[in-house]
Amino acid sequence: MSMTDPVADMLTRIRNGQRASKNEVSMPASKLKESIAKVLKDEGYIADYGVDAADGKPVLNIKLKYFQGKPVIETIKRVSRPGLRIYRSKDELPKVIGGLGVAIVSTSNGVMTDRAARALGQGGEVLCIVA
C-alpha cells in the first residue's frame, strides 16, 4: 500500500523516536525528506542524518538530539498536507513562537526556514513547524 503523506510519516517517526528516547530513527529516503533533515540539522534540532542503501532502496537515518535528557524538539507539526496545501507569500510566512521556532518552507529555491525565505523575498508551501 502506498503512503499518502511521506512527510507526515517522517515527522511522526521523529516525534515517536524522541518520546521513546531512541538515538536514531530510520525511514524510506526521498529528496524532500533529505532536504527537511538538512534544515533540521542546520537549525540544531537533530544531531546528524545520512542516507544508506539497504537492499537497493535508500534509507534516511536521523540521529536525534537531546539536552539534559529531554528532546530538543518540543513540537513538530505538519502544516500543509496533501488534502489541504498551505501556500504563503513572504509577508504571510508564520513566525513560530515569536521567532524561537522555525517553519520549514518549500520554495522555488529549495527547502529552507521561514527566516531564509523572508530574506530571499520568497514565499512557498509551509511544510511544517518545529519548536
UniProtKB/Swiss-Prot annotation:
It comes from the Bacteria. Residues 1-27 are annotated as: Disordered. Keywords: Ribonucleoprotein, Ribosomal protein, RNA-binding, rRNA-binding. Disulfide bonds: none annotated. PROSITE patterns: RIBOSOMAL_S8. One of its GO terms (biological process) is translation. One of its GO terms (cellular component) is ribosome. GO terms for molecular function: rRNA binding; structural constituent of ribosome. HAMAP family: Ribosomal_uS8_B (MF_01302_B). One of the primary rRNA binding proteins, it binds directly to 16S rRNA central domain where it helps coordinate assembly of the platform of the 30S subunit. Belongs to the universal ribosomal protein uS8 family. Part of the 30S ribosomal subunit. Contacts proteins S5 and S12. This is Small ribosomal subunit protein uS8. The gene is rpsH.
